[in-house]
Each structure stands twice: as structure tokens, then as C-alpha cells.
Amino acid sequence: LTVYGLKRPLQLASAGGEYPAISSLAAAVRKTHPGAWIDLAHPASWDLPLLVAHGAVDSVRVVHGQFCRDEVIDRQTGLRERDKARYPGADGLARWSQQIYFHLLNCGLRIPPTAASLSGEVPNPVGYNRTYVHLEGPFSAGEWWQGLRAGQVTVGNGPLLLPLVEGKPPGCVFHAPAGAAVELQPLLSISYRSHEPLRYLELIRNGEVEYSLSLDDYVERKGNLLPLKFEQSGWFLIRAVSEISHTYRFSITGPYYVQIGSEPHVSRRSAEFFLDWVYERARMIRLDDPEERRQVIDAHRQARDFWQAAVARAAAP
């Protein structure tokens, strides 16, 4: 976790290990530092389902420190391993990180993505991985954080994406009554380096590629992407990947949401993905003290209940 907005040094009860549960530490931050922002530093963090279930995550760092200017660091310590047969190479690492985030969105959770360079820890210059926030008025730090909370973001290290859908930035929720349909026209402006052409541009809908456009397609359409029609709740975002061989350079917009009726989009498959993850993580707990073990196991049981409830209310496959 990375915590922003602290007014004084953070006093931690533990320097690491299983006890207390990291969700308890995050809760202590919320209590003692009102207004602090908690960013999950990697989507594959073993404790992601636990932290999300306890309301301890304000944002997820989808563009993280493994993505470097001249390489992709494909070494995972303390992270949930991906299936490298299914997600091979640098592209696979990026798709795995994004897919975890998409599963969160598929559970009806409206958590914005972020980016960070980890300059000083990995071979990245300051500002390589970037979080852009759309502001309606003059810049201020407070307005920037409010814009991030609203999901009005584009994150990445590749092309700068400036989307508008029906005149709205990312984070917008389009509402419609039950039984109605929502038709939307995405408009996108892209800024990229001439020596790093666009490899592809995709619209992601409910975690799947809805369609892909080449740069020629984009230019021909003059920034007007293909229209979308929703007859059920869901979400979508835009992803762009650069044509570059020595690293993986990409950008994604924050998601747009469509809510038809009273319920957001919740996928059973995505909820089960995190429920299985909670069980797998709980089996890793090693604590000798009975009381410490009881407290930590209880935190994981609460997370299990959260994801079981998500499975129960899922209306989508």
C-alpha cells in the first residue's frame, strides 16, 4: 500500500508479517488520518481481495513499477503468480495486471486506476508512469484528488488519451430505468510520439475486447469510435498500446459506467475469482499465537463473506 495525504508520520503497529492483518493497519490509517488516500501498489498483491473487502482501497495501481522505460521487470516477489502459459511475456504481465482490475470492475466496484513510476526503486525516471486527472476548473491539489476520486483519469506510459463520451470524462455513470437501453458515442483524442506509433486501440467492455481499431481506422473516423449500446448495466474503457519492442508501453482511460435499473454490473465469474483468491491466501497464514491467528483468520473470514455475497447477487455470468 502507498498512503498519500498524511499530516504526520504514520505509526505502524507492525513492520510486516501476518499480524496484525494488513486490513487492520489500513483501518487504523483511516481512523487516525482522515482524508488519507490509500493506493494499492500492485493488482496482484496477495491481499487485494482482503483489502477491497474491508474498504481499504481508494485506487489500484494498474500501471505499476514493473513497467519501465527500457524493460519490463518480470520478476514477482510477494505477488500472486500469473499463469504464464495463458499470459506469456511482457504483454502477458500487462494483461494479467489489467485483468485483475477488470475483475474488480466486474464486481460492481467503482475504483479508479492509477500509475506510478517507482523512480529510485526501479530504473524509471520520475514521471514515466503517469496519472492524468481531468479538471473542470483551475488546478489545485484538492481538486486533483477529488477528480481522481471521481475516476476522471487516464493512466499510462504510452499515448495520452483524452476521451469524452456524450461530453463527459471517465468516471461518469450513465443511468437509465430498468428495461431501457443506453446508446453512447465515444470520442477520443490521442497524443503520441511519431517514433512510437500506435499498435492498436481497443474498447474494453465488461472486461472483454469489444472492438479494436488501427491508427488508420482511428484517423479515418476522425476520433469518433464505434457507438455502444447497453441493455444491461456494465462498464467500458479505452486502451491504447504503442508499437515498441523493448518494453510494454500503454495507456488506459478510467472506466465509464452504465447502470440500468438499480443494480450495477456484477459478474459471477469475477466474484468467484476473488472468492477463490481469498481461500488461497488464507491457506498461507502461519501464526503460532492462537489469539493472533484468530484475529487474522477473522479478517479473512469477513473478506470471504464479502465475496460470497458478491457471488450471490451476481446477475451476469
Regions found by a protein language model. Give the residues of each.
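Catalytic cores of extracellular degradative/oxidative enzymes
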Residues: 1-109
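C-terminal functional module detector
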Residues: 28-29, 33-36, 46-49, 102, ...
